[in-house]
Amino acid sequence: MTEFCRGGVFRLLILHSARLTPENAEGSAARLEAMAAEASPDLAILNGDTFSSPIPDPGALLGTFLGPLTRRAIPWTYAFGDGERKTGIPPEELDAVFVSVPGCVRGERAEGIDGVTNAVIPMCADGEIRFLLRLFDTHRETTDYEMAYGSPGRSRLPYPLYSHHYMDGVRFCQTAWFDRDHRKRCEAAGHPLRELFVFHTPTPEHAQIPLNQALCRFDGVFCEDSKCQTVNGGISCAAAESRDVSAILCGHEETNDYFGSWAGMTLGVLPAFASGAWLVTTDGTAAAVRRIRA
C-alpha cells in the first residue's frame, strides 16, 4: 500500500498536452520546475498528449521533462490521449517507455478493454484507502468507427453539442469496466469507495457546463469550441449513478479552463500545459481547484 500523504488530504498536480519535442523539452522542464515548486504536489498526473508527433527518443525527452519531479521525489502517473498515437510508436511500446522513467506509478491496470493506460491507483494515507484515482485511456478518433463498424468514411456524427473534432473518448467497454470493478472493490472493502476520474478527452456533459453557467455553478474561462467526444460512452451517467465519483477532470482543449457541478460531481476541463496546470486538493469527497500559471 503506497502512502501518498498524511492526514488524508491529497495535492494532485494535473497537466496535459506538453507535446514534448527535442526543441521544447528543456523549456517545458523549466516550466514544470516552477509548477512543482509552487504546488508541492503529492502526485503529478500527465493527462494525455505528452507527445503528439513522431520523436526519435521519447524516453530521453520524458526523462528531461520529468527531471523536476524526480529531483523532488514526487511520484507521477499518466494516461494516454489522442496525441500519443501520432508518435507512430505502438501504444504498448510507448507505455513501456513511460513506466521506465523513475517515479512512475503504473497503477492496477485493466486488461482486455480498449487502450493500455486504463488503471486504478488506491490513494492511501495513514494506512487507509481514502479514494480511488481512476485513469482512462482516450486515444482514439471517431474515424476508428469506420473500421470497427463500417460507418461512412469521415462523416460527421451528428450530436446536439457542436464539436469541431472527430473525437472519441471513453468507450462503453471502459464504462463497463468501471462499473464492474467499482462494485467489486466496494464489496471487498465492505463500504463505498470514493473515486476521482482523470482522462484526456472531455465528455459531452463537460460541454454542458459553460452552456448552463448559473445552474452548474460555472467557474473559469470558456473561449474556444468544445472538443468533447462526439460518441457518448456513458461514463458520466455511470459515474453519477454510482454516487461515489467526486470529480471527472479532463483536458484536450487549448485555452478553455473551467469547472462546474453536474449531477453532484465536479466536471472540469484544464487548459493545455503552455497555459498552465491545476493543483487539485481533495480528500476524495470534494475537490478544490487552484490554477497554476508558472
Task: Show which residues each predicted segment covers.
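His/acidic metal-ligating clusters that form di-metal
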Residues: 39-43, 132-136, 148-253, 257
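Divalent metal-coordination and catalytic microenvironments
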Residues: 17, 32, 44, 49, ...
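N-terminal active-site segment of His-dependent metallophosphoesterases
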Residues: 1-70
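Acidic/histidine-rich helix-loop elements
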Residues: 15-29, 51-60, 86, 143-167, ...
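Active-site environment of divalent metal-dependent phosphoester hydrolases
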Residues: 20-22, 52-55, 78-90, 141-145, ...
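Binuclear metal-dependent phosphoesterase catalytic core
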Residues: 2-3, 118-128, 133-135, 226-227, ...
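Extended active-site neighborhood of metal-dependent phosphoesterases/phosphodiesterases
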Residues: 2-4, 61-189, 278-281
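Active-site-proximal beta-strand elements of phosphoester/diester hydrolases
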Residues: 9-19, 130-144, 198, 266-272
